[in-house]
Amino acid sequence: MLKIRLARGGAKKRPYYSIVIADSHSPRDGRFIEKVGSYNPLLKKDDPNRIVVKQERIQEWLGKGAQPTDRVARELSKLGITQWTAGNNPKKGEPGQKAKERAEERAQREADRAAAAAEAAAAPAEEAPAEEAPAEEAAAEAAPEAAAAEEAPAAEAAAEEAAPAAEEAAPAEGEEQA
């Protein structure tokens, strides 16, 4: 099968392409049948020398069955030689089979967690009103005792911390005076 395609030339970072007619199995920059134009992507898009083609030869090769590559077809359509339409592949962005299965499993786990959380929230809410009255009374009685018990150790700890600090500060002051 014959292709109308680009063959790269030029130096590193300075591409220059020849538009050639070549067998589809030959290498990109390898043997070709005929050179039918040139393409210089470094020139501005409105520059007439950006793409130079032999229109009669391209028409002849298209008539013989040569297929242009996408890039060449796009450039030829700008010149009015061929019609180019953008390809549309709606399945390209779809996730694969494994990704779909993982998403379903994740959704199922989240639904199970939400259901369990709803059950857990509903069950204690029903039981809690019956138990709250005695619990509040017991908590009210225990609270003053607990508060007094917490305050005593806290006061002792504060006193212990203050005493060593005072002892360390006293000799330091004495040394400064001497």
Swiss-Prot record:
Family: Belongs to the bacterial ribosomal protein bS16 family.
Keyword Kinase: no
Protein name (Swiss-Prot/TrEMBL): Small ribosomal subunit protein bS16
Signal peptide extent: none
Span list, region Disordered: 78-178
Gene Ontology MF annotations: structural constituent of ribosome
Compositional bias annotation for Acidic residues: 128-139
InterPro entries according to UniProt: Ribosomal_bS16 (IPR000307), Ribosomal_bS16_CS (IPR020592), Ribosomal_bS16_dom_sf (IPR023803)
Stretches with biased composition (Basic and acidic residues): 91-113
Swiss-Prot/TrEMBL keywords: Ribonucleoprotein, Ribosomal protein
One Gene Ontology cellular component annotation held by this UniProt entry: small ribosomal subunit
Keyword Ribonucleoprotein among record annotations: yes
